[in-house]
Structure formats: structure tokens, C-alpha cells
């Protein structure tokens, strides 16, 4: 019985570790193609409302948005929050994100 309880407790506390995290680059495709964060997907700001549900179907997943300097990603954060996404972070500009970059 103790082992089952310990296993259940371990699983409960490990759930956030497995929560999905999505990085969204809200810049225009040309900028994304020049350089972007590794693993990020490109959804330009003006297309966020139309395309986000396909990229991030679970509104409880963590969504981190970035752009060039943080202004457009701030707008994207507001849009996503209004759409019901619960864990949205404005990660700022490309130079601010702590992830490897992909060029070209």
C-alpha cells in the first residue's frame, strides 16, 4: 500500500514537468527564416487568432511568444489570454530568449 501511495504522490508532483511548452515566433516569415529560436514555430502576429488552435490545441499548455523586441509578442500574449490560453508568457525579443538560435 505504501508503494502505491508513494507512486501516486510521485506522479502528481511530476505532472508539471511533462506539461507541454510551445515557443511561437510572431514575426513575419522572412525574419523567421533568417533566424529563429530552435523548435519555435512561426505564426505572424496578424495570423495568431486563426492559426494558434492548430499549433496549440490545449489552452492549458505553456505558450511563450517572442518577436524582435517584445512589442508584438506583448500583443500576441494579450490576444492569447483573451482567447482563453492560461499560461502565456511574453518572452521578449529574439535576443532575449534563452534557447539556441537557428540561422537560415
Q: What positions do the PLM features span?
A:
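N-terminal signal peptide c-region/cleavage motif recognized by signal peptidases
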Residues: 14-16
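Short, surface-exposed ligand- or partner-binding patches at beta-edge/loop junctions that are enriched
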Residues: 66
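Positively charged n-region of N-terminal signal peptides that target proteins for export
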Residues: 1-4
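Rhodanese-like catalytic fold shared by cysteine-dependent sulfurtransferases
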Residues: 21-22, 26-62, 71-104
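Nucleotide/phosphate-binding catalytic cleft detector across ATP-hydrolyzing
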Residues: 7
Amino acid at each position: 500500500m505504501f508503494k502505491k501511495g508513494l507512486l501516486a504522490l510521485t506522479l502528481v508532483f511530476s505532472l508539471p514537468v511533462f506539461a507541454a511548452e510551445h515557443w511561437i515566433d510572431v514575426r513575419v516569415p522572412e525574419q523567421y527564416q533568417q533566424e529563429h529560436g530552435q523548435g519555435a514555430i512561426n505564426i505572424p502576429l496578424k495570423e495568431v487568432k486563426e492559426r494558434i488552435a492548430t499549433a496549440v490545441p490545449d489552452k492549458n499548455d505553456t505558450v511563450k511568444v517572442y518577436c524582435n523586441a517584445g512589442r508584438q509578442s506583448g500583443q500576441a500574449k494579450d490576444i492569447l489570454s483573451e482567447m482563453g490560453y492560461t499560461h502565456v508568457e511574453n518572452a521578449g525579443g529574439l535576443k532575449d530568449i534563452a534557447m539556441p538560435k537557428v540561422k537560415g
